[in-house]
Regions:
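N-terminal Rossmann-like NAD(P)+-binding domain of SDR-like oxidoreductases, especially those catalyzing
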Residues: 1-170, 224, 243
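NAD(P)-dependent short-chain dehydrogenase/reductase
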Residues: 124-127, 149-225, 237-242
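His-Asp-centered acyl/peptidyl-transfer active-site segments
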Residues: 228-230
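Conserved metal-phosphate-binding beta-hairpin within the catalytic cores
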Residues: 234
C-alpha cells in the first residue's frame, strides 16, 4: 500500500529486499501500479540486509533518498521468543545501522520508523497515548522500543528528521496468513467452499485495536510531511475482542 501510494504521486520508489524475499517480490509484481512503475524504472528493488551495515551504507549513498520508511524487521511476537537474537539484530540493531547510514551520508533525509503498540505491554490505562508508560513483555516489543529510543536520540543529538509512528494492528487482505485476522477470514472462506469443517483458534477474549492498512499508510505520510519530527500513536481508538471478529 505504501509503494502504491508513493507511485501514484509520481514518486520514484526504491525498496530493500533480501535474496530470500521471493514472496514479497511476487506480491509487488502482481500489483498493476507497481508492475507498470517497475517497467518504467520508477520502482527499483535492491539487495540489502538490516544485519549488514555495509550494504545499507552503499544503498543510501547510491540512492540519496528524500524519505525513508523503515517497516522492515522480524515482527511476529511468537517468533520473537523462538528467535530473540535475530529479532534484536533486525528490528533493533537494524534500525541503528540504518540511522547511522543516514547520519553519515544523507543527513537531510526524512526518516520514518514503524514502531508498535506492543511497547506498552499490559498497560493500566486505555486508550494509550504518546505519554503512556512503556513496559514491553516480549522480545519483539523490546527490540522495537530500542529502535524507538534510537530515533529519539538521533533526532536530538544529530538534528535528523527522524520520527516514529506507534502503530496499532492494521489489517488488509495482504496481511500474512499466520495472523489471526487472516486465519479467521481464510478459515471462513474454506468452510464456505466445503474445504474444511471447522476453524480452530486459541483464546477469544483478547481485545485489539484493528485498523485498515491503507489508513495507516496515510498516517505514515502525514508524520513525514509534518513541519517538525515527532512520534505519534496511530490507531482507531476502538477495540474489539477476537470473539467479535
Amino acid at each position: 500500500y505504501l509503494a502504491e501510494a508513493l507511485l501514484a504521486e509520481g514518486r520514484e520508489v526504491h525498496g530493500l529486499v533480501r535474496q530470500a524475499s521471493l514472496v514479497q517480490r511476487s506480491r509487488l509484481d502482481a500489483l498493476p501500479t507497481c508492475a507498470e512503475a517497475k517497467a518504467a524504472g520508477r520502482l527499483k528493488l535492491h539487495y540489502a540486509d538490516l544485519t549488514d551495515s555495509s550494504s545499507l551504507q552503499w544503498l543510501v549513498r547510491q540512492v540519496q533518498p528524500g524519505e525513508i520508511y523503515h517497516l522492515a524487521g522480524q515482527s511476529h511476537v511468537k517468533v520473537s521468543f523462538d528467535l530473540p537474537e535475530y529479532t534484536a539484530q533486525t528490528t533493533g540493531l537494524g534500525t541503528l545501522r540504518l540511522l547511522e547510514a543516514i547520519r553519515q551520508n544523507v543527513p537531510g533525509t526524512r526518516f520514518f520508523l514503524a514502531a508498535t503498540s506492543e511497547i506498552f505491554g499490559e498497560p493500566s490505562e486505555s486508550p494509550q497515548s504518546e505519554t503512556t508508560p512503556v513496559a514491553p513483555v516480549n522480545p519483539y516489543a523490546a527490540a522495537k522500543l530500542y529502535a524507538l529510543n534510537l530515533v529519539r536520540v538521533y533526532r536530538r543529538a544529530y538534528g535528523l528528521f527522524a520520527a516514529a509512528g506507534i502503530l496499532f494492528n492494521h489489517e488488509s487482505p495482504r496481511r500474512g496468513e499466520n495472523y489471526v485476522t487472516r486465519k479467521i477470514a481464510r478459515g471462513a472462506a474454506r468452510i464456505a467452499r466445503g474445504l474444511e469443517r471447522e476453524l480452530h483458534l486459541g483464546t477469544l477474549t483478547p481485545r485489539r485495536d484493528w485498523g485498515w492498512a491503507p489508513d495507516y499508510v496515510q498516517g505514515m505520510r502525514a508524520v513525514l510531511g509534518a513541519e517538525r519530527p515527532e512520534d505519534y500513536v496511530l490507531a482507531t481508538g476502538r477495540t474489539h475482542a477476537v470473539a467479535d471478529f
